[in-house]
Amino acid sequence: DVSAAISVADGAIRSIVFFGLGLVALGLYVLFYQATTRFDIHDEIEKDNVAVGVALAGNLIAMGLVVFKAVFGEFVSWQESLAGFITFAIAGFVLLFIIRMLVDIILLPSTRVSDELVKDRNIGVAYIESAVVISASLILVFAI
């Protein structure tokens, strides 16, 4: 049946488009994360700074969960689905940034996360930041 073949092809195209958008969102989040930190992530990872790598990985997992939620659900139309994806991705960027700032202010008031990650290479702080942003993204995914 021709309509069934068209339906399958249309579903495959939608999947490929939203997969690509998810990758773009993750790439943009890495750039956003770099812009909002006080150090160069690439340089620190090249210097074998595991703490920075763990913090980045935790943030990417958190953003990956947000992107999952952004692409999840019933496809209504291109316009509505793309608008929903973009809205949810931007909300994820903002939420994760705010959560990272709150970790600095509330959980580690006597020091800065960036100092602990870069100067002290404190992997414990990297785990704290990762756990908090992943938890916040899970709340966002399941609450909305």
Question: Language-model segments: what does each one mean?
Answer:
Residues 73-78, 101-114:
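Membrane-proximal helix-loop-helix units in multi-pass membrane proteins
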Residues 112-131:
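Interfacial loop-to-transmembrane junctions
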Residues 6-25, 80-96:
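Alpha-helical transmembrane segments
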Residues 18, 128-135:
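Hydrophobic alpha-helical transmembrane segments of membrane proteins
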Residues 52-71:
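A generic, lipid-embedded transmembrane alpha helix
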Residues 38-54:
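Alpha-helical transmembrane segments with an aromatic anchor "belt"
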Residues 20-37, 94-109:
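Membrane-water interface of transmembrane alpha-helices
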